[in-house]
């Protein structure tokens, strides 16, 4: 019996910030169901694919009933009766149906929900795990990066830099790495409390203490790593996501950073000094604005052989934009977010480009998440090497890490572990 798409149904659900988002069910003629929920970002690149929101008074304008209607109407009519096993064909059908460069007609949140759900339905129909359906048998568990201190637009902490992350550089297994991070996370909470600092958590589960500066945040991270005997930079390393678009003045072309107005050159010097003083810092994401390609390229030239420089807002998981970045030698790694581009097929294309160009890849969640663990399977299948999904708090974050634990258990003790640096 030929299996085809029988029904596609979308609904409006709520994400981890209490905002509406799209969830899609794809049902096949063999009775198989594939379900997927779409995440949403707070700090977004200007050239990301467009989330379709309703506007108006309902749900403060953030409703997604239009996107839901597009799934249940035009998209369903275009895809019903199609084989779920030709993902690229179906994704391109939706792209053509939308007819815009940024998916603003049907909505990237509508298209991505269907794209993800079809993949899951096809895997379920074949009775294999999603990561196997994506990636076959040659698989690798990614190195996780945990956001333990939140700043920027993700928390009311007063720190300009958005994320301070830790990663288990040395680990015997994914579970061993997770154990190390959990230990540090709880020790960090005690250290902050002992210093009289409050420990609320931000959107991504990290603590949001009033530490004042980036350097203070990095310095305090050394303490729980040291006290656990993990040696900063040896067993546990540190990374930051500046999300510098949030403090870049596009008109005046400078960065309003920690009470000062810095040029690109001055900000580069700041990062250089930070890396020299704190050698456990191995990765900087979006150190420069998406509108400051020259600054990003200068940092890559100066530091690209010594530290990972991740492009997020500057590339927005878009293969066309990323090709431009490769030509200009901007960054040496790329952050991968499914909803930035809006289909699974285009996301895979971007990852393939990165691999050919020698760029590292890091799969990422969004600040507005759901309990869908899709990116965990995706990171394993794509040999992404790295993943970040928030901290060790908030169930929508931890669920991705728990899914990676399950995958490790399924694959057995001999499964390969991605290693960075290395």
From Swiss-Prot:
Its EC number is 4.2.1.11. It is found in: Cytoplasm; Secreted; Cell surface. It comes from the Bacteria. GO terms for biological process: glycolytic process. Its cofactor is Mg(2+). InterPro entries: Enolase, Enolase-like_C_sf, Enolase-like_N, Enolase_C, Enolase_CS, Enolase_N. Binds a second Mg(2+) ion via substrate during catalysis. Keywords: Cytoplasm, Glycolysis, Lyase, Magnesium, Metal-binding, Plasmid, Secreted. The active site is at 204 (proton donor), 337 (proton acceptor). SMART domains: Enolase_C, Enolase_N. It catalyses: (2R)-2-phosphoglycerate = phosphoenolpyruvate + H2O. GO terms for molecular function: magnesium ion binding; phosphopyruvate hydratase activity. Mg(2+) binds at residues 241, 285, 312. Pfam families: Enolase_C, Enolase_N. One of its GO terms (cellular component) is phosphopyruvate hydratase complex. The keyword Flavoprotein does not apply. Belongs to the enolase family. HAMAP family: Enolase (MF_00318). Catalyzes the reversible conversion of 2-phosphoglycerate (2-PG) into phosphoenolpyruvate (PEP). It is essential for the degradation of carbohydrates via glycolysis. This is Enolase. It comes from Streptococcus thermophilus. The gene is eno.
């Amino acid at each position: 019996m030929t299996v085809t798409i029988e029904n596609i149904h979308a609904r409006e659900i709520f994400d981890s910030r209490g905002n509406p988002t799209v969830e899609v069910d794809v049902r096949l003629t063999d009775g198989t169901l594939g379900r997927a929920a779409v995440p949403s970002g707070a700090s977004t690149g200007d050239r990301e694919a467009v989330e379709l929101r309703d506007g108006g008074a309902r749900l403060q304008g953030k409703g997604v009933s239009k996107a839901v209607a597009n799934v249940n109407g035009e998209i369903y009519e275009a895809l019903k009766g199609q084989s779920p096993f030709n993902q690229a064909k179906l994704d391109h059908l939706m792209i053509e149906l939308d007819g815009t460069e940024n998916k603003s007609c049907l909505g990237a949140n509508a298209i991505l929900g269907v794209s993800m759900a079809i993949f899951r339905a096809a895997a379920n129909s074949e009775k294999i795990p999603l990561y196997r359906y994506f990636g076959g048998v040659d698989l690798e568990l990614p190195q996780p990066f945990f956001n333990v201190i939140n700043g920027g637009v993700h928390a009311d902490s007063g720190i300009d830099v958005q994320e301070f992350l830790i990663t288990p550089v040395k680990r015997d297994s994914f579970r061993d790495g997770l154990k190390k991070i959990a230990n540090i996370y709880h020790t960090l909470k005690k250290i902050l409390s002992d210093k009289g600092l409050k420990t609320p958590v931000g959107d991504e589960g990290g603590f949001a203490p009033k530490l004042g500066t980036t350097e203070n945040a990095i310095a305090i991270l050394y303490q729980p790593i040291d006290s656990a005997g993990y040696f900063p930079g040896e067993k546990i390393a540190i990374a930051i996501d500046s999300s510098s678009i949030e403090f870049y003045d596009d008109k005046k072309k400078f960065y309003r950073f920690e009470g000062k107005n810095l040029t690109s050159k001055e900000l580069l010097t700041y990062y250089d000094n930070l890396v020299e003083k704190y050698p456990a810092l191995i990765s900087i994401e979006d150190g420069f604005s998406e509108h400051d390609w020259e600054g990003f390229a200068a940092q890559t030239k100066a530091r690209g052989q010594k530290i990972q420089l991740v492009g997020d807002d500057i590339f927005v998981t878009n293969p066309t934009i990323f090709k431009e970045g490769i030509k200009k030698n901007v960054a040496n790694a790329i952050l991968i977010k499914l909803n930035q581009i809006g289909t699974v097929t285009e996301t895979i294309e971007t990852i393939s480009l990165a691999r050919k160009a020698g760029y590292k890849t890091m799969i990422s969640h969004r600040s507005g998440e759901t309990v869908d663990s899709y990116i965990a399977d995706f990171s394993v299948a794509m040999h992404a090497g790295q993943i970040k999904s928030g901290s060790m708090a908030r169930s929508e974050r931890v669920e991705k890490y728990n899914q990676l634990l399950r995958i490790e258990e399924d694959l057995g003790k001999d499964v390969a572990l991605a290693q960075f640096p290395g």
